[in-house]
Amino acid sequence: MYGAGVVTRMNEAERFHMTDPGSTKILIYAFNYADRMLEEVPYLRYSAERSLCFLGDLRDPGTRLVVITSEAVDPATLDYHLRDVFRFDEPALADVRRRLTLLTPASRAARPLDSLVLEDEALVETLRRAVAERPAGTIVDFSASPATDELGRRTGATPEEGDHAFVARWGSKSGGKEICLRAGVAVPGGTSEVLRSEAEVVEAIHRLSCGTAAARRAMVKLDAITWAASIGNVLIDRDKLRHTGDLVGSAEVIRLPAEEFRRELAEQGAIVEEFLEEITDSPSGLGHIERDGTVRVVACHDQVLSGGQYWGCRFPADERWRPEITDAVRRTGEVLSGLGHRGAFGVDFVVAGERGLLAVEINLRKVGPSHVVRYAEALVGARVGADGMLRGADGRPVYYTHGRLLEPETLGKLNPRTAVERLRAEGLLYRHDTGEGVALHVLGALNACGFVELTALARSPEAADGYSRAAQALLTGPYPSA
């Protein structure tokens, strides 16, 4: 039930979600996507910098952080986080830096970061010693993986996102759909049956055509958790399939080469769903299951999609859907908790005409908005409340807009210090005294890829959008040289 706008303030321990007063935390945001994604999306290499949202944990004098990134963190990026985002004062900075270690693996291969770490014996030994220095050790990972499980065994640290075998089963497309059905959350037409041949998929699409979900198109989703951002989805024209019987030849949208799709279908399987034509909104809910099994709804967002892929979000989600999203996320989390999941999870929804809110995917990992809400809570100094709102010290709501910018020609000419100082000079960088402005993330990708993320916070949605537009124009447009 929604509250009456109570501000959820945090003490120092709660503010940064700290639970282990004497601990070593290894921050490793490894993206265990298919190799094709890691090769073709260069900024993913720098997205490990999202883990810098946890630097506030250094307020606890018993905590040591070891941050692992694919590329070295620029000193200006670190300085921006410590001073501007988390506001460590000068007397505290020396001790904070002493308890902070930044590491990169020796290999620069386009493979998941945790795999590269595991292959670096010297780095693993450094981590093992760091964990041994304190009573407890945690791996703050983006998602579960075999490499992270093994890294936990070799260092003595506990991965935050649980066991990979569990996540592979229940975080797959079929597993997620089954979870939603168990939780009583509405989903698109189709079943959670895993199909492993083109003939089985064709038959499932024909069966779907005969049911109540008689849309013109169907969606085939590769089942494995490695296929994210809709890369493993294939949109099928049902009429064409009915006349030709050729699955791949009937595809309106397919992002993989035909042979790779067929190989993945045979090895990992796929599910078939109706394709929803009348989508007006794409909200999402983020939850977390504590070690004792308690389910917490963290936040609800409206997603900004580009080509079916996540490209940003707005907070909070539309109030028309927020209570229903909150309830669905909680019920989904209760099913997951009962099965044994611990850690983060996200549920993606669509609003489909008269059918309303439908869950289309579950992710048993941190998700696109995970670091965003953590940055926002750190900047504001409060958690999202039971009413689904984030409020400042004065009790007024705070809204934010998060987006990704990929402009190689212009952003590629900037470095982290220049980007931060340009926003500061124009009064756009987030100011703690006003509670408004723009925060920057993944600054390391500026020079290399022309990519950066920004989150604009303000006291109204319109003002947040205005800050975001102004910051984007400033970073990508002409600017007088000093």
UniProtKB/Swiss-Prot annotation:
Phenotype of the disrupted gene, per the record: Cells lacking this gene produce lowered levels of both L-propargylglycine and L-beta-ethynylserine, that are terminal alkyne-containing amino acids produced by wild-type S.cattleya.
The enzyme's E.C. designation: 6.3.2.-
Broadest EC class assigned to this enzyme: ligase
This protein's pathway: Amino-acid metabolism; Antibiotic biosynthesis
GO biological process: antibiotic biosynthetic process; L-beta-ethynylserine biosynthetic process
Catalytic activity: L-propargylglycine + L-glutamate + ATP = L-gamma-glutamyl-L-propargylglycine + ADP + phosphate + H(+)
Keyword Hydrolase: no
Highest taxon above the source species: Bacteria
Keywords: Amino-acid biosynthesis, Antibiotic biosynthesis, ATP-binding, Ligase, Nucleotide-binding, Plasmid
Entries under Pfam families matching the protein: ATP-grasp_3, PGM1_C, PreAtp-grasp
GO function term, MF aspect, one: metal ion binding
InterPro entries in alphabetical order: ATP-grasp_PylC-type (IPR003806), LpgL-glutamate_ligase (IPR053705), PGM1_C (IPR041356), PreAtp-grasp (IPR040754)
Family matches, as NCBIfam families: PAGG_GluLig_BesA
Function text: Involved in the biosynthesis of terminal alkyne-containing amino acids such as L-beta-ethynylserine, that are produced as antibiotics by S.cattleya. Catalyzes the ATP-dependent ligation of L-propargylglycine to L-glutamate to form the dipeptide L-gamma-glutamyl-L-propargylglycine. Is selective for L-propargylglycine over norvaline, allylglycine and the standard proteinogenic amino acids, except L-cysteine which can be used as a substrate to a lesser extent.
Protein name per Swiss-Prot or TrEMBL: L-propargylglycine--L-glutamate ligase
Source organism (scientific name): Streptantibioticus cattleyicolor (strain ATCC 35852 / DSM 46488 / JCM 4925 / NBRC 14057 / NRRL 8057)
Upper taxonomic lineage: Bacteria, Bacillati, Actinomycetota, Actinomycetes, Kitasatosporales
Gene name as annotated: besA
